[in-house]
Curated annotation (Swiss-Prot):
Gene3D superfamilies: Winged helix-like DNA-binding domain superfamily/Winged helix DNA-binding domain. It is found in: Nucleus. Residues 359-370 have a biased composition (Basic and acidic residues). DNA-dependent RNA polymerase catalyzes the transcription of DNA into RNA using the four ribonucleoside triphosphates as substrates. Specific core component of RNA polymerase III which synthesizes small RNAs, such as 5S rRNA and tRNAs. Coiled coil: none annotated. It comes from Scheffersomyces stipitis (strain ATCC 58785 / CBS 6054 / NBRC 10063 / NRRL Y-11545) (Yeast). GO terms for biological process: termination of RNA polymerase III transcription; transcription initiation at RNA polymerase III promoter; tRNA transcription by RNA polymerase III. The gene is RPC82. This is DNA-directed RNA polymerase III subunit RPC3.
Length: 599
């Protein structure tokens, strides 16, 4: 494979190969992109094999591999007793590049410029040693501030300790531990081979978890000096992509709450999610990445739910109303945001005119919340309930009302009340509902309401023919046929041929249709990935077409004097390039926000 053929070659491999190669080419250069494309195509290879397939000299390949390993773009593995080193693709580094702009923007907003600079240095270098970074600073006071920022980022899980096994593929680590355990598990006449293998798997799981959690004890991570707890300066840290994926999940769930419940309740929901975000379950688990370990979808679902339930039992993802009240933004005013039964009753019944002049005192009564707090209620003349609150109107009772609203509803529950006043977030069920909701919205907006009705109908029926669907959705068969064709063309439905005769004559054959979420989501995800890769390729192609002009603008004597030194046609081309790049970047980010839900 030649460098010139790289874009077309990666385009025909798979959507992910196309996107990952495009990102690698933009950030790391053509040689790195070619190596990554080769590893995606052929799997694990040695440096000699990579050189043979890419036509790049071995010395240059090894030099590039060192940089790619440092950037978490490639795993390496050496079998015990062998000198050969195998390399395989690691998508973590490429995904960090994909989200790098959003990562720095988010850290800047919530942690400040200095923290963003630390994260940016980690992203650029792949990983850094804390003492190496701190020693570059001369001012002692500044050093202490930077150490504090490192401690805060580490505590909030934005950066994590990097250990040697992080450079190895999960499958190879598992296989090595499993073979050692199986070898040490003796065969007996009373124990079947199935039971022996199952026992070895359980022991290997324990060893694997212990390996992942090794080096995470407080004595390994922290030092206490003069009564101040700080990170061990000898630690090597890297960016935690899983932590940023949790932030993306929070953003998606808040958008869902906005569309389903409303803006004010969504603001409260956002604060609740941020309260438990750092302790929430990861989107992926090493056991789910090991091929052949968990194959059954039901078993995988049970495993994910068990992780979530364990966090709830440990109170890591549980919050109460008072904790949430302290975290709410000061500019959020919840007064009159809840309509009570008195308001509805007032509007449904005629007003009784009073013989008095209307200056009677309004009745007040005490209500008791689930937190056993007595709160005074004042019934206004319009029937609304005025609840005593603090300065910005965020009383415990009002927050409780909004949480009740979020934990109820006919659709998926955004919160679950486990004990009076204590709530948790059902992440597993919410992510499933989030995918369904966005998929149905996409069908409705792109293919039309009739296609949306047919899709919902098939979800309910599981399987059906044109006539059954037509009777269910109350549309003509011709309309149903046209809409089914559109859904089939978009790979959102599957078709099954049912012959009525042994010769399978077309005149005696009818067709059944079904919708399977997994394959529909997979096709949608691949389409989004391909679209993102196309946008990046278009930007790169347009820049290469005007390479001479861009190099001219980068010259020191031209910078800042473009209007004086460039021709009018060159200025127009430069403006067109900028407009096109901004437009494509906006499109890319919109597609990426949808892709993040289905990845």
């Amino acid at each position: 494979m030649d460098i010139g053929d790289l874009p077309e070659a990666s385009k025909t491999q798979s959507p992910k190969s196309y996107l990952y190669t495009s990102i690698a080419r933009n950030h790391l250069g053509d040689v790195a992109a070619l190596i990554i494309s080769c590893l995606i195509s052929y799997g694990r290879l040695t440096a000699t094999d990579i050189s043979h397939r890419t036509k790049i000299p071995v010395k240059k390949v090894k030099s590039a591999l060192v940089s790619l390993i440092q950037m978490n773009c490639i795993f390496y593995w050496r079998e015990s007793g062998s000198k050969q080193v195998f390399y395989s693709f690691n998508e973590t580094g490429i995904l960090v590049f994909l989200h790098s702009g959003d990562i720095i923007s988010h850290v800047t907003t919530h942690y400040g410029e200095d923290s963003a600079e630390i994260v940016q240095n980690i992203l650029v270098n792949g990983h850094i040693r804390i003492e190496d970074y701190v020693n570059n600073i001369d001012d002692e006071e500044k050093k202490l501030d930077i150490q504090t920022l490192f401690f805060r980022l580490f505590t909030d899980r934005w950066i994590v300790r990097l250990q040697p096994f992080n450079f190895n593929p999960v499958d190879d680590i598992w296989n090595q531990l499993y073979q050692e355990t199986l070898k040490n598990t003796p065969r007996t006449s009373t124990t079947s081979e199935v039971k022996r293998v199952a026992e070895a798997k359980e022991k290997t799981k324990t060893k694997f978890i212990n390996l992942i959690e090794s080096g995470q004890s407080p004595k390994d991570l922290y030092l206490t000096q003069d009564g101040i707890k700080r990170l061990n300066p000898a630690l090597v840290v890297t960016f935690n992509l899983s932590r940023f994926q949790k932030h993306l999940r929070t953003t998606a769930l808040v958008s869902l709450a906005k569309s389903r419940v409303g803006l004010l309740s969504a603001r409260i929901y956002e604060s609740a999610l941020k309260l438990v975000e750092a302790s929430s379950p990861d989107l992926t688990h090493p056991f789910l990445q090991i091929s052949g370990l968990i194959n059954d979808p039901e078993e995988a679902r049970f495993f994910v739910n068990s992780i979530e339930n364990k966090l709830v039992d440990e109170k890591k993802t549980v919050f109460n109303v008072r904790d949430l009240g302290r975290l709410l933004p000061h500019d959020l005013d919840l007064r009159n945001s809840i309509l009570t039964y008195n308001f509805v009753k007032h509007n449904l019944t005629p007003k009784k005119r009073s013989a008095s002049n209307g200056d009677d005192e309004r009745p007040t009564k005490k209500i008791k919340t689930e937190d056993s707090d007595d709160i005074a209620e004042s019934l206004e003349s319009n029937g609304t309930v005025q609840i005593e609150s603090n300065g910005n109107g965020n009383s415990i009772s009002l927050i409780q009302h909004h949480l009740k609203l979020l934990s109820s509803g006919s659709g998926a529950q955004l919160l679950i009340e486990i004990t009076p006043g204590s709530y948790t977030v059902p992440y597993a069920s919410l992510l499933k509902y989030l995918k369904q909701y966005n998929f149905e919205t996409l069908v409705k907006t792109t293919l039309g309401p009739n296609s949306f009705r047919i899709l919902r109908c098939l979800k309910s029926l599981k399987i059906g023919d044109e006539k059954t669907i037509s009777n269910s959705v109350l549309l003509k068969e011709k309309t149903v046929r046209n809409e089914i064709y559109k859904l089939l063309k978009a790979n959102m439905l599957e078709v099954q041929e049912v012959p009525r005769s042994a010769d399978r004559a077309a005149s005696k054959t009818f067709y059944l249709f079904r919708h399977k979420e997994f394959y529909s989501y997979e096709f949608l995800c691949n389409s989004l990935i391909f679209s993102m890769a196309e946008i990046l390729s278009n930007i790169q192609a347009f820049r290469e077409d005007h390479k001479i002009l861009l190099e001219k603008c980068e010259r020191e004597d031209v910078k800042g004097h473009e209007e004086e030194l460039l021709l009018e046609s060159e200025l127009k081309t430069l403006k067109s390039l900028q407009t096109r790049q901004v437009s494509n970047t906006v499109r890319f980010n919109r597609i990426k926000s949808l892709y993040e839900i289905y990845q």
